[in-house]
């Protein structure tokens, strides 16, 4: 399971973006493939060209996008995201949500994503909505049928 926490500072361990991504990638591939994967995931989260950037120079939103890139590069079949767009501006939120949707819709590589959100507008990117009330599952339905109470 790939994980993305709400606060990226609780997840980032390495001094720059490339080294953070490297600890999440399968090392049994060629250096050329590693470089391609790093470029691809950074582009997917709007951070193309950031691979050598020191983590301490990143904004909170950039750190969050880096953690999402780390989850994507790990080639997991399931990603759990705890409010992955919480620290992002609206443009970055949309890019990340579209990326997650595109990746989960790609039938060549099965990927499921469960993300926790308090933002009603994010539901349109989901295939299903599970609502929790008082710690229990209270409903499971299509996003178009969900009504916020």
Residue ranges and their predicted role:
Residues 32-50:
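Conserved ABC ATPase "signature" region
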Residues 54-58, 62:
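Conserved ABC ATPase signature
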Residues 68, 96:
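Hydrophobic anchor residue at the start of the ABC signature
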Residues 71-72:
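ABC ATPase C-loop
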Residues 75:
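Conserved catalytic motifs of ABC-family nucleotide-binding domains
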Residues 79-83:
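Catalytic Walker B motif of ABC-type/P-loop ATPase nucleotide-binding domains
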Residues 90-92:
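Helix N-cap at the start of a conserved alpha-helix in ABC-type nucleotide-binding domains
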Residues 136-149:
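Conserved beta-strand-loop-alpha-helix hinge in the C-terminal portion
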């Amino acid at each position: 399971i790939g994980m993305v926490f709400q606060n990226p500072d609780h997840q980032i361990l390495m001094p720059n973006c490339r080294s953070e991504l490297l600890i999440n990638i399968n090392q049994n591939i060629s250096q050329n493939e590693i470089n391609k994967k790093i470029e691809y995931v950074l582009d997917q989260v709007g951070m193309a060209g950031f691979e050598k950037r020191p983590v301490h120079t990143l904004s909170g939103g950039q750190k969050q996008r880096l953690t999402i890139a780390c989850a994507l590069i790990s080639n997991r079949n399931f990603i759990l995201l705890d409010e992955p767009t919480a620290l992002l501006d609206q443009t970055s939120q949309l890019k990340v949500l579209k990326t997650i949707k595109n990746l989960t819709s790609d039938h060549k590589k099965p990927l499921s994503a469960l993300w926790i959100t308090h933002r009603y507008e994010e539901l349109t990117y989901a295939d299903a909505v599970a609502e929790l009330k008082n710690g229990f599952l209270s409903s499971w339905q299509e996003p178009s049928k969900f009504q916020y109470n």
